[in-house]
């Protein structure tokens, strides 16, 4: 085995076990977004996750951890300007703890329509504006923005991860949970 890849919104759960993982190559993707409990009901608050991100980065190294700002949804409460402002604050906080930020925009799947009916696809113009500005902000803080590999089925390469109806965070934008009762 060359590498274990981790994707999480809550790295705190793994911190007590890091000594067991040190013999292995690792790469961590930690999703941190500024949404509140109305969108991400069971995700720890952003400040706590950023603190744990820093601890994890100190353990694995800046080149073995990436920040996911994902998904980007634009609506009346989460405007383009709001995302730019929040991203700037977050990038400043994470400066020196990662060199990579992966972004993606919300995908409107049927499960997303059911859980977040007000969600709309982000317009091409808003995607361009957000992408351009986030790239500039990230560069200012020593990070490179990369897009998520959306639309590519990479399962044949061992990249497809996760299982449906298993995540207890219950984010409104998530396509992986069809039935909340199955998760519980």
Give the residues covered by each predicted segment.
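N-terminal [4Fe-4S]-dependent radical SAM core
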Residues: 150-164, 184
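Local cysteine-cluster metal-coordination motifs and their immediate loop/turn environment
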Residues: 162-178
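Conserved AdoMet/S-adenosylmethionine-binding subsite of the radical SAM
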Residues: 1-119, 123-126, 130-134
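A C-terminal junction/extension of Radical SAM enzymes
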Residues: 114, 125-154
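Electropositive, surface-exposed helix/loop patches at the edges of structured domains
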Residues: 108-110, 140, 163
